[in-house]
C-alpha cells in the first residue's frame, strides 16, 4: 500500500453541508494523512466547533485545528447540532490558520497537499506571509466552472462559482498569482453530485454503529431543516467530496492542463494570456462508480 498522502483541509464547514461530508470522507480514508484542518469564510468560532465536533466523534483529536479569517454572511446552518460544544476542550486547537498552514508545510519532510473547499482567505494570508510554502505543498481546489457541463439547472451559463465569487481577491492572491501547483476540481465534475436515496439510507444505517457517521447524519438532518431543504430521499449536492476523491485517486476523472483566469465577474475562463496553468478535472468516466465508492467508504466497507 502506498504511503498515506499528507493533507491539510481548508474548509468553510458549517455553511453548506458538503464540507462535513468531505471531512468525514477524509477521516474514513486510510490513503490520507490528515494533519491540519483550517476554517475559513464566515462565523469562524462556530465553524471551528463544527470541525472539532466531527473530529472528536471520529476519535481524531490528534488532528490540529486552526481558526482562520471570517466574514459575512454568518451561515450558521447546523448551530442546533453544534449546541453548547466547548471549543476550548479540543486538545490541538491552534491560534490562527495562516501560521498553522505555514508551520505544517515548512516542518514537513514530505510535500503536503492542501485541499481547499471554501474561499481562499487563509491561502492568500499564508502565501503572502511565506511564499516559500509553495515549494513544499500543492493545492487541490474545489472552484470554478469551465464548460458548465454538469451545472445545467444549478447555475446560469457562465456564472461565477461560489468559492471564487465569495472573495475574488482571495482567489487571485491565494491561487492565481502564486507559484503553487494547482489541481482544479470545477463544477464540471463537482456540480450535481449527490447520493440517491438507497445510497443515503445505507449511510444512515452505518451511523447506527459508527459515531462519526451518526454525527454526520444528525448534522445533515439539522441542515435540511435549517435550509428548508425539500427533502425527498437523496442528499443535497456533495460538491466537496469530489476534492477528497481526487486526493485519493485520479481514476475515473479526466484532467487537462489549462490556463485558468477569473474575470471581474468571477467567471473562470480559459485564457492563455492571463491564466495560471492548472491541472483541471473536466469529465467523469462513470459518476455512478464514484457514488458507489463514496457510499462504501463512509460505511467502512473499503
What kind of region is each of these model predictions?
Residues 1-302:
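N-terminal acidic, glycine/proline-rich low-complexity segments
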